[in-house]
Amino acid sequence: MKEVNAPLSESVVYWMRCEHRSQDNWALLYALQKADEKKLPFVVLFSLAASTPNCSYRQKKFLFDGLEELKRSLEKHGVFFVNADVETPEELAERIKEMSPHLLVTDHSSLKPQRKWLETVAYHTLCSVVEVDGRNVVPLRAVSDKQEYAARTIRPKIHRMLEQFLVPFPSLSKLEGHAASFFSDPLTAPLAGKDASTAVSSFVPGEKAARTIFSTFVKEKVHQYLERNDPTKDALSNLSPYLHFGMISAQRIVLDMLENKQVPVEAKEVFLEELVVRRELADNFCFFNPHYDSPQCFPQWAQKTLAKHRADPREHVYSLKEFEEGNTHDSLWNAAQWELVHQGKMHGYMRMYWAKKILEWTATPEDAMRYAIYLNDTYSLDGVDANGYTGVAWSIGGVHDRPWRERAIFGTVRYMNYAGAKRKFKVDVYIQKIAMASGRLLT
């Protein structure tokens, strides 16, 4: 993204800001290769503020708690880990300049805050800057140069290029020579109390935990993945927090899944559709649509139909506080909110129901979008993510969807209700399970 001749060439720096792992990391491998070619010291640079802009305490704490393991793993391979305790991209750029890098390598992100950090750092540094897409199996810019309309338009583009990019990872060998030595700030835990979230124990952070969860999914759960839309079944992979923070590679998951002959073909196909096509569609949406976090991102048909029904009477209108506390008339919605607050992750099917009901029970689509994004980005370990923003935009504003039968409030945006959920799964079982797990009394 930036090519200049550095006045001094004393190191190669990999600024790790999205893909927080030592294994199966294309940016790390590329930066190491360049350091070896130039016979220069190599360093991995980390900043909690740079890795978590707009994140809540819960998300920062989850990432932070996996850092010691990451640091040890890198140092075991001879890679020097530098922590920069800074708050702004300008401060980070100053730390980078102190290292006099020949090259700065960093991770791809489609989100505005992360892109702003990179833009500012690149502007203030005096070396070439390369951004490596380690999030997507097929790199975002290789797939398309525009916002894709739906999964059906991006799917063939991804499938055509999948074989080209779905290659084995080289192993990370121990770095010999070219040792780096730069000042590193002590790892300091984020401060609690700056928002409503608290740390959760539902998920153990780090690469090792991510690999264990994936292994458990393949051995014990993937056979029932076709029942993933039933929240009473333990059929989900639960990998989204780890994928969000780059503690495991999506490409590694795909490679291992394709090689596994024990996984049923249909379950494998559906899982890979979610992991590759749907996930990369979300990244495409956020990269090419700067309004991904507001109703301006909705397709024209959805904007028109929601405007037409804007003044429709609402039987229930809740405040953000009532939503946050799971204090609505709908016990199913409340359970989904409790799951989010107390476990740090909501079941995938319930995320759709949850967001659509926020539209139904707020005065405007703008309020609905704002509330849903706030709640997801505050409480979900995989919040502040392209998948989350796209999911909210799909639920509330028909992004990547089509018009349905017209009704009050929703217009022709797809509708979901309690009766439909009851037909799909045992609602009472889900509510009871979440109430017990979150220590709630059912009334």
PLM regions and their residue ranges:
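Alpha-helical packing segments of well-folded alpha/beta enzyme cores
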Residues: 27, 66, 70, 210-217, ...
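Trp/Phe/Arg-rich N-terminal binding region typifying the photolyase-homology
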Residues: 1-169, 173, 338, 360-362, ...
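Active-site-proximal binding-pocket segments
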Residues: 18, 232-431, 436-437
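Glycine/tryptophan-enriched, flexible segments
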Residues: 140, 146-301, 424-443
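Generic alpha-helical secondary structure signal
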Residues: 61-68, 90-94, 119, 148, ...
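Short low-complexity stretches enriched in small and charged residues
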Residues: 1-5, 57-63, 199, 207-210, ...
